[in-house]
Design a protein with these regions (language model features):
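Flexible, low-complexity linker and terminal segments
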Residues: 11-104
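Short, conserved beta-strand edge motifs with alternating hydrophobic and charged residues
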Residues: 6-10
Length: 104
């Protein structure tokens, strides 16, 4: 393919995200396993490949370990916001075909 290429990489920031430094790899993995940050390749705007989710997890598991999302859980659970985030993750999973066929 001629022309520019673009790579978007998720790199957890322990200080900015309010998460433990030893959790950075786990948070990056959770971001993909929830469907919030799909890993895929595209050419000319068309998805050509995607990394399948091995173990699907709800978005809450990704949000809870991060202090930047604490307002979604305390003082009261913001279930409407979490549901919208889950809906977005579910849409990504369908759009990018992230589940193996037997889980689809």
């Amino acid at each position: 393919i001629r022309g520019a290429r673009y790579i978007h990489i998720l790199v957890p920031c322990p200080l900015g995200w309010g998460a433990a430094p030893h959790d950075t790899v786990r948070l990056a993995r959770l971001a993909t396993e929830t469907g919030l940050f799909p890993v895929f390749e595209a050419e000319h705007g068309e998805v050509t490949d995607s990394s399948k989710i091995r173990h699907r997890v709800p978005v809450e598991e990704y949000l809870k370990p991060q202090r930047r999302f604490a307002h979604l859980f305390k003082p009261t659970l913001q279930s409407d916001v979490i549901a919208r985030l889950q809906s977005r993750a579910d849409r990504n999973i369908r759009r990018f075909h992230l589940l193996p066929e037997e889980q689809g």
